[in-house]
Structure formats: C-alpha cells, structure tokens
C-alpha cells in the first residue's frame, strides 16, 4: 500500500532550520484527506500553521503538536502553499489570506496499536510522531529501520503514506520533511510493530 501511487501525497518538502516538522506532518495528513475526499491534490500551507496556531499551544519554529494543528485547521480552515509560501521562519502576526480548505473533524489513532494504525493508514496518510535524534535515523539511506533501533522518545512529526514488507520485515513507509536528498528520496521505512 502506497498512497503516493494514488496521487494524494505532495512532493517531499524541506523544513530547513525551523523546528516545524509538526506542521509538515499535519499538512501532509490534511492534503491526503482532502485529495481523497475531493479528488484534487492541493499543497496546504505549513506557514499558516507556524504563524497562526500559537493560541493552540504551537510555537512556530520552536516546535508544536499535530493535534493542535488539526484543531486550528478545523476552527479556521486552511490556505494553499501558493497563497502563503513556506519561509522557514515564524512571524508575530497571522497573515490575512483566503482560507478556503475546510476540515470538519479528525480522528486520533490509539497509541501503540498497530492494527488501529494499519486501519487508519488504509484510509489515508496519517500524521505520527517518532524519535528522530538517533544517528541511524538521521543518516538513513535504505532498508528498514527495525524496532530495536527506532527509539521511543518522540521528537519529530512525520507522515505515514503506506506500508509493505521488505526481506520479511513489515514496515511503514514514512514521508519526512528534510527534503528529497535525505533518506530514500525523502522517505524512510520503519519496522511495523506495536511501539
């Protein structure tokens, strides 16, 4: 299963030197859900979340949570990357732009439940948090990172866009926000387990 083949995943993006992974993870899930519902892939603005969701507890380039980003999107709607491009920095004020991409709800997947996550990913790309401060992850280029080496201290928002099996190991196909030169064209395979 690979949502890229269904045309509901935008190209790999690069957050640069801004701690905004949470916004890329959230917009990736929104882009997928919107494309599936409307049969149209739109590139949703991460910058809007960075600049405008502070009252929801997000801190722009200093971190944030995908849940808060989804709450903001439901309350205020979203705009496109074309209308509000990513700048890899935050602004004090929320820019005034047309926000015409609406969402009515989001569903939280049970933590540490592989079956629930598998069911969710079979419906659309899913926003998740992982531990990315390990050298194994940072210098990943191919293969499957196994559960033993994954880590459990979440510090990075990413997007699951599919799943499969490689050399007998079940994996999640994960889109990162460190540009297409990182990993395997911007993607990583993480072993599929309950953690």
Regions inferred by a protein language model and the residue ranges of each:
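Catalytic-core signature of thiol
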Residues: 1-195
């Amino acid at each position: 299963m690979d949502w890229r083949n269904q045309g509901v995943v935008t190209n790999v993006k690069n957050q640069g030197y801004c701690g905004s992974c949470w916004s890329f993870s959230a917009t990736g899930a929104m882009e997928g859900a919107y494309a599936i519902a409307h049969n149209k892939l739109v590139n949703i603005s991460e910058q809007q979340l960075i600049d405008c969701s502070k009252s929801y507890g997000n801190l722009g380039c200093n971190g944030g949570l995908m849940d808060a980003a989804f709450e903001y999107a439901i309350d205020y709607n979203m705009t496109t990357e074309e209308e509000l491009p990513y700048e890899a920095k935050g602004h004090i004020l929320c820019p005034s732009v047309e926000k015409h991409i609406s969402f009515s709800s989001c569903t939280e997947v049970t933590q540490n439940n592989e079956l629930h996550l598998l069911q969710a990913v079979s419906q659309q790309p899913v926003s998740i948090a992982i531990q990315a401060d390990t050298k194994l992850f940072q210098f990943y280029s191919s293969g499957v990172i196994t559960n033993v080496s994954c880590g459990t201290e979440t510090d990075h928002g990413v997007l699951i866009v599919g799943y499969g099996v490689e050399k007998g190991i079940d994996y999640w196909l994960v889109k990162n926000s460190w540009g297409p030169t990182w990993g395997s064209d911007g993607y990583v395979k993480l072993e599929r387990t309950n953690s």
